[in-house]
Curated annotation (Swiss-Prot):
Negatively regulates Toll-like receptor-mediated NF-kappa-B signaling by disrupting IKK core complex formation through interaction with IKBKB. It comes from Rattus norvegicus. PANTHER family: LEUCINE-RICH REPEAT-CONTAINING PROTEIN 14, SIMILAR TO PREFERENTIALLY EXPRESSED ANTIGEN IN MELANOMA-LIKE 3. This is Leucine-rich repeat-containing protein 14. Interacts with IKBKB; disrupts IKBKB-IKBKG interaction preventing I-kappa-B-kinase (IKK) core complex formation and leading to a decrease of IKBKB phosphorylation and NF-kappaB activation. Interacts with CHUK. It is found in: Cytoplasm. LRR repeats lie at residues 111-146, 194-218, 219-246, 247-282, 283-307, 308-339, 340-360, 364-391, 392-416. GO terms for cellular component: cytoplasm.
């Protein structure tokens, strides 16, 4: 939906040279809408000039590219145009160069000086990448190169330079991009472009590089650290964690692929684990924790007891959780605050089922997002859990992919979940009825890799759709797409 003001603005920008000349004559109140229209329609010349002459201290993508009163389209929920993103960066560079040229000849007007360009909140990479759009990796590279280029042109001179511009971004780094990102962070310290990271995701970096990068980040800006290693043991974790823990106001910590054998502990391993726990106790604002590691098996209580405040999001995928881990979590102070819970890859069938049901009851009042991928939940376990599951009245998302459920089990879930008014998304497995020659009980690997009968599954989808229509729940998405952008980020819950 577009208002008359939006359509008029779009018409004004059709001729870019004329629009650029007219910008100084337009009320500054129109600039936010001008920016959104120019970004949406890839009016790159206008975009560059808008950034160059931006009349406000803050230029925020999250504010400007969301749904607004004049346009219902939320661009931040889409992959952003490479042309438009590059135009913004070029406009910022032109602005800095112009201010440098003016600084020695006339006083700098600070009242309407752009101080912050906030490019955070961009859609993260999907499975497929449109070549005409900019991924988070591309954005990181583009911003880093801009900061390096600015440093090579010149640094700020005391008494003459304009106010530096802070670029807030979410950074993604791997082995290929590490060197120039480190250089960008180093060069931005004394530059007119100050690189400020809100969320950091590092993939497959050596420990020394990870530490070096963490040492360059501004603790006042950082909100999330997401470290993804191919293989990090307890010893490596004990090296990394003190550099992470210096960000005491961190809100989200995600540690993936941390390996350790809790069944055969060594003296060094126990010392490293205790050191890790001590460092975790330093965080005073942590609200989200994600750790995928079997080292927590049987001692989840030790980790959760060290934290200074209750968590609102807890992801414990493939942690080999034991019944006592689930019981402790249910009785802990965290349970009453959890909005997001991910227990994927933990067997919730045998002895774990009853403690899991107790945990569901404990989190029912607050839970919005529940992920149970590959948890060995068959029809019997699902039916036994439904009375507790449906008490989660605020639940919006339920992930059950990779579980050995039949069509009959899915239909029971659909019928019983009608009372969950907030439920919007159910990611369900391909029913076992759609496989041929399936061993029982089927391992998760078989469910994920075996071929299904497409004709049978088409009938299943049609029947589920009819049931949703009949129950007045057509707005609820039932899907087998685990690679879509359906799982909400904690900060967007």
């Amino acid at each position: 939906m577009h208002t008359l003001v939006f359509l008029s603005t779009r018409q004004v920008l059709q001729c870019q040279p004329a629009a650029c000349q007219a910008l100084p004559l337009l009320p500054r109140e129109l600039f936010p809408l001008l920016f959104k229209v120019a970004f949406m329609d890839k009016k790159t010349a206008v975009l560059r000039e808008l950034v160059h002459t931006w009349p406000f201290p803050l230029l925020s993508f999250q504010q400007l590219l969301q749904e607004c009163a004049h346009c219902s389209r939320a661009l931040l929920q889409e992959r952003l145009s490479t042309e438009s993103m590059q135009a913004v960066i070029l406009g910022l560079t032109a602005r800095i160069h112009a201010r440098e040229a003016e600084a020695g000849t006339q006083p700098v007007c600070r009242k309407h000086t752009l101080r912050v360009l906030d490019m955070t909140g961009l859609l993260d990479d999907g499975v497929e990448q449109d070549p005409g759009t900019m991924s988070m990796w591309d954005c990181t590279a583009a911003v880093a190169r801009t900061c390096i280029a600015q440093q090579q042109v010149g640094t700020a001179k005391p008494g003459l330079s304009p106010v530096p511009v802070e670029i807030r971004v979410d950074l993604r780094v791997n082995r290929a991009s590490y060197t120039f990102l480190r250089e960008a962070l180093q060069s931005s310290v004394d530059s007119l472009l100050r690189l400020c990271c809100r969320d950091l995701r590092a993939e497959d970096l050596p420990m020394r590089n990870t530490v070096a990068l963490l040492q360059l980040l501004d603790a006042g800006c950082l909100r999330r650290i997401d470290l993804r290693f191919n293989n990090l043991g307890l010893r490596g974790l004990s090296v990394i964690i003190p550099h992470v823990a210096r960000f005491q106001h961190l809100a989200s910590l995600r540690l993936h692929y941390v390996h350790g054998d809790s069944r055969q502990p060594s003296v060094d391993g126990e010392d490293n684990f205790r050191y890790f726990l001590a460092q975790m106790g330093r965080f005073i604002c942590l609200r989200e924790l994600s750790i995928g590691s079997s080292l927590l098996s049987g001692r989840l209580d030790q980790l959760l007891s060290t934290l200074q405040r209750p968590l609102e999001s807890l992801e414990l995928a493939f942690c080999a959780l034991l019944p006592e881990d689930l019981r402790f979590l249910a009785q802990s102070s965290h349970a009453a605050h959890l909005k997001k819970l991910d227990l994927s890859g933990n067997d919730l069938s045998g002895n774990q089922l009853t403690p899991f049901q107790g945990l569901l009851q404990a989190v029912a009042a607050t839970l919005l997002h529940l992920e149970l991928t590959e948890c060995q939940i068959a029809d019997a376990q699902l039916l036994a859990t439904l009375p507790t599951l449906t008490r989660c009245a605020s639940l919006r998302y339920l992930g059950l992919y990779g579980n050995p459920l039949s069509m009959a089990g899915l239909k029971e879930l659909l019928r019983d979940s009608v009372i969950q008014a907030e439920l919007r998304t159910v990611v369900h497995p391909f029913p076992v009825d759609c496989y041929e020659g399936l061993p029982w009980p089927p391992p998760a690997s078989v469910l994920l890799e075996a071929s299904i009968n497409e004709e049978k599954f088409a009938r299943v989808e049609a029947e589920l759709h009819q049931l949703l229509l009949a129950s007045g729940r057509a707005h609820v998405l039932w899907t087998t797409d685990i690679y879509g952008r359906l799982a909400a980020d904690y900060f967007n819950l």
